[in-house]
């Protein structure tokens, strides 16, 4: 069994570097950072945990940035997004970001993705809440094409790009 630690990293929390070092020293397998780009003040969907949304949801730093910092300070701990909201991100840019993080961490990146629950947040990114899982699937498929082919192309309902080249490729094989 493997154990990891997760938290919303903010400018007032323990840093991802300090937590990653402490977890690695204690033999933990992984550190995880969740993602929310922002929290709209209007709310169509209630917080799944009930009540008011905890402050760290509003204040969370970008998970890829904090995990990159943690990766540079550590040697063995795996670095995971828990979860990345890829239906709110561009597939081509995210593929490059994920591959770059996997490269600079020597293959320690774990790409956790999820469909999300905050309808308002998604809509601010141009994502239709009801089609988020189909969009997410296409973005994952498109990213896998980018990661596994020297000349990638993808043609879907939501994601469409002609043959292109992009580097780096991830250290791990998707």
Residue ranges and their predicted role:
Residues 1-73, 173:
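N-terminal beta1-alpha1-beta2 module of alpha/beta enzyme domains
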Residues 41, 52-53, 77, 81, ...:
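Internal, glycine-rich beta/alpha segment that forms the wall or movable "lid"
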Residues 64-72, 78-87:
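Structural motif corresponding to the early beta-alpha repeats
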């Amino acid at each position: 069994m493997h154990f990891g630690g997760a938290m919303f990293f903010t400018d007032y929390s323990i840093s991802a570097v300090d937590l990653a070092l402490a977890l690695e020293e204690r033999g933990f397998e992984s550190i995880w950072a969740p993602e929310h780009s922002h929290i709209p003040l209007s709310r169509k969907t209630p917080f799944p945990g009930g009540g008011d949304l905890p402050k760290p949801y509003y204040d969370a730093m970008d998970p890829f940035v904090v995990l990159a910092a943690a990766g540079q300070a550590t040697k063995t701990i795996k670095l995971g997004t828990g979860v990345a909201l890829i239906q709110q991100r561009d597939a081509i840019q995210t593929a490059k970001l994920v591959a770059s993080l996997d490269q600079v961490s020597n293959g320690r990146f774990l790409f956790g993705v999820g469909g999300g629950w905050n309808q308002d947040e998604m809509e601010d990114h141009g994502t239709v809440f009801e089609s988020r899982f189909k969009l997410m699937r296409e973005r994952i498929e498109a990213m896998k094409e980018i990661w596994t082919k020297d000349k990638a192309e993808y043609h879907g309902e939501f994601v469409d790009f002609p043959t292109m080249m992009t580097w780096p490729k991830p250290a791990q094989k998707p």
